[in-house]
């Protein structure tokens, strides 16, 4: 439908975010549906992964010239950073259950959103500069490049994600989750949902 012109530009712009949110919904279904824990921190982890991969893409646009390879390296780096933050948040939070787990994970997502809204990051020949005040307080040289511009986010990144890549990632996610559910660990996950004491 895209190549024949039968799809509006609005719908074309919504296809990649729809794929992204489908992947998040699959992960949320694994946590809430199969594990039985009400964790609402997925948006915060998704935010960390997205900003890390976009910042890597923006910072290495001049040095990493192969766009396809840069995209997949950024994807892996974003997933690893989100996983590390998930592990670090999970250490103290795993003792909680029910509404308390939901409150703490929701608070984590809000904290991440508020930090990123005030974060300014730039790069120049002196290195990487951070500020939580404004762009002027970075103290960059005139030829410096902004990576994260506070509430504006990361601007000027190349649009490398496509609907085809999104569908492939949805299928990979479904494959991994279905194999996990049907494995020994998946049966243990569902046993936790059915009987926490066991």
Task: Tell where the protein language model's regions lie, with residue ranges.
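Transmembrane alpha-helices and adjacent helix-loop boundaries
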Residues: 1-198
């Amino acid at each position: 439908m895209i190549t024949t012109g039968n799809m509006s530009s609005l719908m074309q712009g919504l296809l990649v975010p729809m794929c992204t949110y489908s992947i998040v919904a699959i992960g949320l279904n694994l946590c809430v549906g199969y594990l039985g824990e009400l964790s609402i921190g997925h948006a915060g982890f998704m935010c960390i992964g997205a900003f890390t991969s976009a910042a890597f893409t923006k910072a290495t646009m001049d040095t990493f010239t192969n766009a396809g390879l840069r995209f997949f390296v950024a994807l892996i780096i974003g997933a690893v950073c989100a996983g590390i933050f998930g592990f670090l948040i999970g250490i103290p939070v795993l003792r909680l259950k029910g509404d308390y787990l939901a409150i703490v994970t929701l608070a984590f997502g809000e904290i991440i959103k508020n930090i990123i809204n005030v974060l300014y990051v730039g790069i120049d020949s002196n290195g990487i500069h951070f500020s939580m005040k404004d762009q002027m307080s970075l103290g960059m040289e005139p030829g410096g490049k902004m990576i994260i511009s506070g509430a504006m986010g990361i601007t000027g990144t190349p649009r490398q994600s496509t609907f085809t890549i999104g569908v492939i990632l949805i299928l990979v996610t479904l494959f991994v989750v279905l194999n996990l559910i049907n494995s020994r660990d998946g049966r243990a996950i569902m046993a936790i949902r059915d009987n926490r004491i066991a």
